[in-house]
């Protein structure tokens, strides 16, 4: 029960920080054009976000972290960093589809930090449910930000916001990995 209480103590940040940053930038940008796409498109994008989150979490947390930490008994911090580097590098591939190099690098840094956090959540809970929920929520708000406004361009302040949020995620994930629940590992 102590592990569950400790997990819930931390989960609120993972569930809210990046989505709130995305929604805040979305609102500050001032263009609410959901009607341009229609509800079918919006629901389709939300479903895609959840399927992508599920697939990535099954691979990175459900397979890699599970095998490294619980199978090969690699220290959680080392396993989390290795998997998070791979997760961040994978997001660099977005430069081939829609992103500029600056945005792809920013997204990779954010993905690394979020991955540390998601890895800690998975190690503590031994469940992918929270990881998929957090990842899906981040994906949904990110896609909403990208699709809602074709004029949306990240300026210096947006880069600083995303880097600050990434830093908070990173620190929070490291704290979870080093928390008293992890001492037995």
Regions found by a protein language model. Name each.
Residues 1-53, 143-185:
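Specific transmembrane helices
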Residues 18-19, 84-87, 136-139:
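Residue-level recognition of pore/gate-forming positions within transmembrane alpha-helices
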Residues 42, 46-47, 77-81, 100-104, ...:
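The feature captures the transmembrane alpha-helix scaffold of multi-pass secondary transporters
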Residues 49, 76-92:
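Small-polar-interrupted transmembrane alpha-helices in polytopic inner-membrane proteins
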Residues 49-55, 88, 107-112:
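Residue-level hotspots within the lipid-embedded alpha helices of multi-pass solute transporters
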Residues 55-82, 120-127:
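Membrane-interface helix/loop boundary segments of multi-pass membrane proteins
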Residues 88-95, 117, 170:
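Transmembrane alpha-helical segments that form the membrane-embedded catalytic/substrate-channel core
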Residues 103-160:
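Functionally important transmembrane alpha-helices
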